[in-house]
Curated annotation (Swiss-Prot):
It comes from Bacillus subtilis (strain 168). This is Uncharacterized protein YdjI. InterPro entries: Band_7/SPFH_dom_sf, SPFH_YdjI. CDD domains: SPFH_like_u1. It holds the Pfam family Band_7_1. PANTHER family: FLOTILLIN BAND_7_5 DOMAIN PROTEIN, ZINC-RIBBON DOMAIN-CONTAINING PROTEIN. The lineage of its organism: Bacteria, Bacillati, Bacillota, Bacilli, Bacillales.
Amino acid sequence: MSFFRNQLANVVEWEEFRDDMIFYKWNNREIKKGSRLIIRPGQDAVFLNNGRVEGVFQDDGDYDIESEIIPFLSTLKGFKFGFNSGMRAEVLFVNTKEFTVRWGTKQAINIPAAGMPGGMPIRANGTFNFKVQDYISLIDKIAGVKDQYFVEDIKTRIISILDQLLMKWITREGKDMFNLQANAFDIAKGIQEDLDMQLISDGMTVTGFQIMSFNYPQEVQDMITKNASYGMVGDVNRYQQISMTDGMASGKMSGSGAASDMAGMMMGMNMANQMMNQMNQNQQAQSSGPQSTGSGSKPNFCPNCGTKTGEANFCPNCGQKLV
């Protein structure tokens, strides 16, 4: 009975295919006479003999191993099946698709910033893409000792070094610490190159790295939003005028009744006219080109808190916009 069992042909295939599995090794010790190889779409089959690559087959289909595979192997191409003996070989099935993985910093990383001795705590998140590129390196470094390998294994490796790379490239490419998203493309490009160098020796390549967002502490985000409001209306006086107009429109200012409503409406109209006049004056001044006077120069001390200013366009102490 055991004699006939040894003669049963194998079906060499990756049956339990998973999208998150990078490769799977079929190693049932012997390939019997009459066995078939099944390659499904999105898979490559690599024949191995004693750890050496005998052949790589990339076209999906159903193949007779004796007549359609063995003739194309390297050292085993002359192999003949015996009456009661099979071919000792392993078959590595590789997932050929490009993998997309989400990433995010587990904890905030402190980026050096002016006026912040401990650095600016920042979180970030996004995605990266990778795929298998070199089967020889993959086998030498990973597949030689593992029967299967998952996307999660790669993600763990990437996350372990990502904080250092973010700090490196934010410091190098981040032109404005309060608006890092403006330089997200350059930061991501540098990180992708470094990650690719980490994985290329293992037979994989990083084909893309994207930063979806940078996240600041709430108090810093509030300061950024406040400064954006200042910049949008031009100066503090205009900001106060808009705030007062909004307060009257929402009914939050003191006073009630028809007289109060009428007074509020008249005041709002007057402020709106003043704001329009100021905006028109600014537009005319801008259209006339840059002036040689120092009215648009950066002050030596912050007008809001009095702190001495540096090279940045914002006060290092309170975040006040300086120019």
